Amino acid sequence: MKRQVKYALLAAALLPQISNAQELSADVRQKIGDLLDNVALKEISVGRVKIDSVAVEGKTLQLFANMNCAYIPFREDNVAEIYQGVAALLPAEFAKHDLQIWTNKRCIEDLIPQALRSKKDKKAKVFNPAVSKPLVTNVSAPYAPTNGLQDKHIALWQSHGWYYEQELSRWEWQRARIFQTVEDLYTQSYVLPFLVPMLENAGANVLMPRERDVNTAEIIVDNDGMLTGKSTYLEKTGDKPWLQGNGVGFAHLRNQYKGMENPFKEGTFRTVETIKKGHESKVEWTPEIPSDGRYAVYVSYQTLPNSADDALYTVYHKGGETQFKVNQQMGGGTWIYLGTFGFDAGKGSGKVVLSNRSAKAGKIITADAVKIGGGMGNIARGENDEISSYPRFCEGARYWLQWAGVPDSVYTVSKGKDDYGDDYKCRGIWVNYLAGGSSVNPEEEGLNIPVNLAFAFHSDAGTTLNDSIIGTLGIYQTDAYDGKFSNGASRYLSHDMTDLIQSNIVNDIRALYEPNWSRRGMWNRSYYEARVPRVPTMLLELLSHQNFADMRYGLDPRFRFTVSRAIYKGMLQFLASQYGTDYVVQPLPVDHMAVRMVGDNEVELTWQPVEDALEPTAKAEKYIVYTRIGNGDFDNGTLINGTSYRTAIPTGQVCSYKVTAVNKGGESFPSEILSVGRAFQSKGEVLVVNGFDRISAPADFVAPAPGDKEFAGFLDDQDHGVPYVQDISYIGQMREFRRAVPWMDDDASGFGDSYGDYETKVIAGNTFDYPSVHGAAILKAGYSFVSCSDETVESGPVALKDYPVVDLILGKECQTKMGRGGVTPLQYKTFTQPMQQAIADYCGQGGNIFVSGAFVGTDLWDNRLATPEEADKKFATEVLKYKWRVGQAAKMGKVKTVASPFPSLTGEYTYHHELNEDSYVVEAPDAIEPATKDAYTVMRYSESNLSAGVAYQGDYKTYIMGFPFEAVRTEAEREALMNAVLNFFKPEK
């Protein structure tokens, strides 16, 4: 289609438009609008598409549709369909006219993202800043992507945060507490555990204006001294001396900061000249770690005219040492994130070392403070200089940016008068500050980082009365800065990126979970976060956190993973189109894992890749095996070509392994963790089967009709759900279940209103690391052990009969829906038919099996999502010899052994019955009872005397517990319990 007249000229030709519009009847316009409506309704949920005006310029007919038309995701096929359909509706006098359909100041074919065009527009400028070296490079990584996001810098933030409200003189959330979360924390549950790692695994440097570490401890080690603790800063001089830098640096002079105080303007920094060979000069920052845990490591330095682009930092941690090269030609005077690592409590368990060795001699390396951990808020606000008393990761961007040394012109446009406005405004201004001085933003001063794109992750408000989905909205802005980026590229590139990301999100949700997921508009509107950044930017409103139908999906970690992967894919597509490269999507995590003994001191680990039905490029090419010995942490990994790995192990220690798949696009998320241990003078070998795969949203309900219009909600006390590793967005139980109660204020949010007693807490979930917990107790009892995933037993590679004892981990496994349910099959059944068959065969051959899980009975007898199967109950009663009595059997987390024919089974035990950061919660354990005369109750819940454990001895032995072994509170209790179980399984003499 020819485009002979630009939109600007058309706007000026208003009178010809009006007169010529009379040549196209209202009836034809209506039919064209209906056609466009039909195209739109295939994809989006918006208002009607209308033809607002018509113009005839020579032999060109131009139709101008309203903005609803611009919300259609235009592709070559539907654009051709539209033009063909509209042409057929035109009167005969227009048969030989060239036809153009305009919306959003563009012909519709120009709104097809460049990434999705079969023929590229070679004249269109792209946004592709060049970079010789990225900000941070992990040089210890065994594999680097070539067709991913390598060398790219992405500015990304999750919405809102805890802030100081001047009008009320209090700290508060920027949104309402609703459906067990608050937007200020909710979007973090996508960004931090899922989206950021995906982008980093693809090679990107991700820059954030909020604290990314949820650890509330923070250690500052600085050349200007430490405010507290015994951390040390040490310089070691080689061939080149350390000198005082000219200018200011960081100093930690106070516990809290008022007004516009800037810690990066209150201290000094150190400099040294680089060498290529000879004796290195080094700085060592040695922190005093308050407690065992994982901590983010940040470094700081100053950027000088002659700065090196390869400053070598080494982080010493529980898993070994990891090296990074930092390009100090950018990013000076703020906190630069290296990675997150495990450290032991105390001083000497870890350190950060900076060397002056470089590829080029005569450059300058600078050294300033190191920050370890996330910490608590330390920015004081209001007349009483009140700090938030919340973890820093809860706070809004405005406060992090002050702590990170960003100029006050960025984080407080209001000069300290309006923190709410400052918080949403500072994010976009911060993007420009990051890019200031680079080719991306050469007109402003800043950190010289060539930012490729910016992304604001929000959720929206709004409700529906019929449990339909509000859905996904994308926002961008094209008019700012005369509609162009600094290199002359059109700001309509933000439309391209918005379309790609929104399309990936909606298409993937529809394909995997909810065919009726709503795609809302793509708004070209002047939202501050979309307008201000001088880089391609999208503001995402993923769903409505106020709408129950949306949040039935939105609280599920599986949904969060899928959405985050879709966002990553959209960014990848967009950036590949800007650089003219082919992209490859990182693989999905591997499965079908097993580790077994081979020879006297070796083990073999095996696994299988997982195909991605939604992405043909996401194929595994190689793998990385990560190793953890004893109570250490995982190493930097070993690159493997095939699907197996053999290695020697030390005797008497638990050795653990996780695997990632890699390809040219990057690295997958990690697999579950399997463990193995060879005991000194081993009494035998135990197979640990990890059957706890579940991650899910909490239980929910809709009251039976006619009450379905009156009551609904989430039921934590029945089933809190299972977070992926940990949950950083949960605030407390829902307390308002009446649908009719409206939002009145953020302090009275109506239907869905929730408590806030957990909003500063990190809640433990499924770590996929339980074979090591079981294995440590097995090893202590004098037995060796190996482990495998449940699917290897179900599909056959691992034979239970090869092991005298089997320990099946079921955790909180139970049949679980996604969202409203009924669209996809239930997942996470405790005992699938193949598993039942494998166990029945094993028991028939005289095996010994230990099974523990919170829903071992409920899932087969009383799962409200599934119809009980007689075959399932028969398996439990006739093979494992137990039957279900009741769910939600206890609340106090205490069990005791009771008199039985089995004297080895003794002791009292406690398990995690409340939400905490160490173990997933067991809020609703099962009471189970003997199903045959040779089976006995051997444990009871202390508060009710309901049966908690059943043991059977006959031709084989079973020990079944209605609560999970790995949730037992202390190592000593677990060792005693496992020893009792294994003694029970000993053959009688």
What would you call each of these model-derived segments?
Residues 357, 369-377, 453-481, 513-581, ...:
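Active-site-adjacent mobile loop/cap segments within catalytic or ligand-binding domains
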Residues 574-617, 665-684:
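Pro/Thr/Ser/Gly-rich low-complexity, intrinsically disordered linker/stalk tracts
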Residues 352-364:
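Short beta-strand-plus-loop segments that form exposed binding edges in beta-rich domains
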Residues 646-667:
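Beta-strand-rich modules
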Residues 812-920, 934-935, 942, 973, ...:
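A glycine-rich, often tryptophan-bearing local segment used as a flexible ligand/cofactor-contacting loop or short
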Residues 394-491, 495, 523-546:
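Active-site microenvironments of hydrolase-like enzyme catalytic domains
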Residues 726-867:
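Helical hinge/lid and interdomain linker segments adjacent to catalytic or ligand-binding clefts
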Residues 281-305:
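A short beta-strand element within beta-rich, extracytoplasmic domains
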